[in-house]
């Protein structure tokens, strides 16, 4: 007989990836890492797939059943991919189908999105390269550096507790266990 308690206890996550700011070499470690948090119910990646720079993503998307979201670059210098990702995140939030989000980008433009999702009670895991701006890191409940995941090393995480004051310093620490409750 199936014990349904195990299914109910798993948190459901939406994984949203900014293809403009993340390399395809990180995809397996990203999915493995967030699977430690719960069940991935949405796997979406955003970019202008007509650009040759994103062609290398094709096999990774097929192998991991990730839905590519096409967003044309309408104007030079503007990032319409970010806008599409933010709109989708809000749609998913209001669907009430997830308990948390994993935002994968090294772009500080997602700082307000992470903060807004947390205001709505969502658990937000950020993932990005070490060049990620500190405000985005601080806006997430937990942040994981992709370089360490890809190398299979102990992950650097920048963790924030919702109860901490804004005046506290958020340190990047080495940890063997990077799963948070």
Region roles according to the model:
Residues 46, 99-106, 113, 117, ...:
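Acidic beta-strand-to-loop metal/phosphate-binding motif
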Residues 13, 99, 141:
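Conserved acidic residues
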Residues 91-97, 146-154, 161:
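A polyampholytic, Gly/Pro-enriched intrinsically disordered region
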Residues 159-181:
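N-terminal regulatory modules in eukaryotic regulatory proteins
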Residues 84-88, 139, 158-164:
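Short, surface-exposed amphipathic charged segments that create phosphate/polyanion-binding patches used
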Residues 2-88, 93-94, 115, 123:
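Domain-level signal for Mg2+-assisted phosphodiester chemistry and nucleotide/NA-binding surfaces
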Residues 115-156:
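Intrinsically disordered, low-complexity glycine/proline-rich and charged
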Residues 21-23, 49-52, 108-110, 131-132, ...:
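Conserved nucleotide-binding/hydrolysis micro-motifs of P-loop NTPases
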């Amino acid at each position: 007989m199936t014990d349904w308690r195990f299914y109910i206890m798993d948190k459901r996550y939406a994984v949203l990836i900014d293809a403009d700011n993340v390399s395809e070499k990180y995809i397996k470690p990203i999915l493995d890492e967030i699977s430690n948090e719960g069940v991935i119910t949405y796997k979406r990646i955003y970019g202008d797939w007509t650009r040759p720079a994103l062609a290398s993503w094709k096999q990774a998307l097929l192998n991991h059943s990730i839905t590519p979201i096409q967003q044309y670059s309408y104007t030079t210098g503007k990032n319409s991919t970010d806008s599409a990702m933010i709109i989708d995140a809000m749609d998913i939030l209001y669907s009430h189908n997830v308990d948390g989000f994993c935002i994968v980008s090294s772009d500080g433009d997602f700082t307000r999105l992470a903060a807004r999702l947390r205001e709505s009670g969502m658990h937000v895991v950020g993932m990005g390269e070490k060049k990620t701006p500190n405000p985005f890191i601080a806006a997430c409940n937990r942040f994981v550096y992709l370089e360490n995941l890809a190398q299979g090393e102990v992950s650097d995480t920048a963790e924030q507790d919702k109860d901490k004051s804004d005046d506290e310093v958020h340190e990047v620490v080495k940890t063997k266990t990077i799963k948070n409750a």
